[in-house]
């Protein structure tokens, strides 16, 4: 029972960590990455589809993304989705291929993005603490129902805290790595 609670908490903490990684991948650094645009939703074929289902996204140069739609009819819709996104990048297209030149970030924009990274890391830490709190409540319930002893409850609390600390360190590391990427010129 205790192991089930700890396993469930660990699984949820892994998901929270992965969600942070995925979110931070969409934050623009000075270098081109398909993750910047692959999540964008494009109005095509009467539905809203992610860009990575409509085109291949390549990085031929460090500051250039090339988007090659599978169907040339979707070029305008993809360009429009990029323009409407918060990326701040203007696409150029020749009717078949869309090119995104990734401009150098200004110092002010870098600091703004760093604050955004810190905020996302903090949100993820809050999610971890909520997961820990829910697991502690489950353990408390098990103890009240006399399914585990007080000693088992205390040991499980310590294991849960170690687990939480490990994931918090991982979040801090992910955040610091992304901040360094953003601040890199």
From Swiss-Prot:
Superkingdom: Bacteria
Gene3D superfamilies noted in UniProt: 3.30.1360.40, Ribosome-recycling factor (1.10.132.20)
Can you list the GO cellular component terms from the UniProt entry? cytoplasm
User: Know the name of this protein?
Assistant: Ribosome-recycling factor
Single annotated GO MF:
ribosomal large subunit binding
PANTHER family reported for this sequence: MITOCHONDRIAL RIBOSOME RECYCLING FACTOR PSEUDO 1, RIBOSOME RECYCLING FACTOR
InterPro entries in UniProt: Ribosome_recyc_fac (IPR002661), Ribosome_recyc_fac_dom (IPR023584), RRF_sf (IPR036191)
Subcellular location per the Swiss-Prot or TrEMBL entry? Cytoplasm
Among the record's GO biological process terms, what is one?
translational termination
Q: What does this protein do?
A: Responsible for the release of ribosomes from messenger RNA at the termination of protein biosynthesis. May increase the efficiency of translation by recycling ribosomes from one round of translation to another.
């Amino acid at each position: 029972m205790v192991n089930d609670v700890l396993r469930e908490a660990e699984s949820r903490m892994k998901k929270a960590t992965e969600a942070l990684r995925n979110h931070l991948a969409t934050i623009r650094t000075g270098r081109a990455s398909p993750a910047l645009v692959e999540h964008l939703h494009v109005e095509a074929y009467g539905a809203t589809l992610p860009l990575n289902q409509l085109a291949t996204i390549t990085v031929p140069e460090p500051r250039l993304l090339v988007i090659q739609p599978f169907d040339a009819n979707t070029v305008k819709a993809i360009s429009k989705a990029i323009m409407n996104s918060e990326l701040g990048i203007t696409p150029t297209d020749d009717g078949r291929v869309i090119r995104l030149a990734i401009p150098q970030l200004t110092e002010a924009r870098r600091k703004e993005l760093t604050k955004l990274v810190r905020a996302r890391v903090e949100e993820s830490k809050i999610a971890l603490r909520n997961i820990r709190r829910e697991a502690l409540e489950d353990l408390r319930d098990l103890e009240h129902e006399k399914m585990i002893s007080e000693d088992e409850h205390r040991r499980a609390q310590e294991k849960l805290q170690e687990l939480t600390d490990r994931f918090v360190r991982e979040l801090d590391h992910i955040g610091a790595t992304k901040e360094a990427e953003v601040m890199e010129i």
